[in-house]
Amino acid sequence: MYALPQHWPQWRSLAAHLNVKVGLLAEDSGGSSFDEACSLPWLRLSRQFPDAQIPLACLATTVELGGQANTDRDDALAWAEGILAFLAEQGLITGEWPKPANEPCEGMPFEGTELLLAPHPGVVSFLRKPGEWVEAGDEIFEVIDPVSDRVSTVCAGTSGVLFAIERLRYAQPGFWLAKVAGREALRHGRLLND
């Protein structure tokens, strides 16, 4: 789930309803993502004209639901119900939905995302699952080159939530295979890479 840091308090309930594992927060990650394209102009206007007291309008977020490989009907139904429950909480629709079954996840700076790269070509074997908290030094995946018998284990360099893994299982050197969202800024400038 992606959002402006200033909007995160309003999005925490949706994150809980959807069982999101991490909120990635940035004002301008580059690439004009949906949430920033809708919300950032209001933030910029309020900073440009502070005396006008322009509210931070257009609450927008980008939510990734399960990735391309997850087309499970039960998951899709749960996500749809979570979105409807959030809309009802906001008074935008009528109806009764249960409170979130999960606690809201932590919002992390998008700048704290570590990209774990393939050190060489080979078959990828993931050792951890998306959504898990990992510590710096934890083994995240192995790359096994069947031609040379070279095996490399790639570890997290930061503590945080493992929030994305590459769906393809053959590594190419220099391409990311996993992403960990940490609490401390690691990157600056253009943060979107896909």
Give the positions of each predicted feature.
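Structured catalytic-domain cores with a bias toward divalent-metal coordination
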Residues: 1-194
